[in-house]
Amino acid sequence: MGKPPAPIDMHPAPAEGAEADLSEQQGLVNDGVRKFAFPKEHPLRYALTNELHARPFEMLTPPVQTSMYATVLGEGAGSGVFDHLKALCERYGVNPPHRDMNHFSADFGPFRLRFERHTEFASYTVLRHGPFDVPFEKPASDFLPREWLESMPGEILLAIHVAILPVEGPDPDPQLLSDLFVPESLVNSILSGNSAQVWTDLRIHGDGHNRILLKPYDLPPAKAGRVVQRLLEIAAYRNFALLGLPAAREVGPELTRIDSGLAKLTAETASLVESGPEGNVAGQSNQTGATHRESELLIQLMQLSAEIERLNSRHSYRFSASRAYFALIRSRLTELREERVEGYQTIQEFLDRRLAPAMRTCESVEDRMASMSRRATRAANLLRTRVDFKLERQNQGLLSSMDRRAKMQLRLQQTVEGLSVAAITYYAVGLVGYAAKALSEFGLPVYP
């Protein structure tokens, strides 16, 4: 028997010069980065993926001091915010962010700055690592240039200091807490499964800032950054959610006035409808007077609807924003996983007692505006239907009258035509008679 055939190599080595082509076919390029031959990609594919990582948490190693400022931005304030931030970057030799960036974080040497731009506000968070003697005595914001801080664009709605104590140090004693916070308003809770403890009183102190004191027990840098970020977001969103409360109080009396007028017009409209298609109002004895009153009622209902829509367009954004901020606050509180400390309220309990009623007021006013708008629309539609029905009946009567007149005109025309035929026949016979007499006088045998 001959030698067995050589085994076939199922994976032959590529020919020289074809190795690069094969690597590219397999999706390999330089530096181990894979390149795939996709069909046409969606233009937002990378932008949407990067959005999930656009605002990473800061890495915080206690002890750390943090200051945050949230400023309300007006229309067209974008360029001013960028120029203001760019001036600080140039002062410290830091590359400024792109004009359209909504998030920026950089090390400025004495401090680290985190900037975020939201829909209606911008936030500046200053971080400084290192030991400190007394919390809030020399906060992180003191390391910002004073003139830069004072020229910050927009209106300050939140200014807050956060002090993170050393892990190995003792817990703050009652005397220190009494010096730092208002005892009657002090809130205290354990966070994230006994990983930290937080104290705050949610008040503005003499330096114009709120205060949060955090004692870490088991907080790795990434987790510490998440906890501080959530506490700061709760503080900011709390104030922005409460912006809807003054609007709700302002619009309340106007809604009461409009509601009273709407109730009166609705009652009169119902009285009209119940009186039947030909019914009168307040003893009016003619249909013209009733129709005139219906037109007046319709105009007044349209005016009330316009007032309701004016209020709705002015305040609906604020109420919707408050509802969205409140939902974010509840989400952040859930993420903190607070546990009660005997004798103190948690942050969630405090906000449930104080913030939740304010949000219910905003929701009540918003629902009231929507309800009044629907009521005014229904009343106007009801009255408009009645007016349209009466107009339709009037049109039917007019058409019937026109039909009767047309029939009378037709009969008259037929009568006139019959008389005309008789008259023409009479005159024709007369003419024939005259002609016959004339012909007989000429001797023709014609006998009329």
Where are these regions (language model features)?
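Conserved helix-loop functional segments at active or binding sites
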Residues: 264, 268-271, 328-331, 335, ...
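Structural beta-strand/beta-sheet cores of well-ordered domains, especially the beta-sheet scaffolds
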Residues: 65-67, 120-122, 210, 360, ...
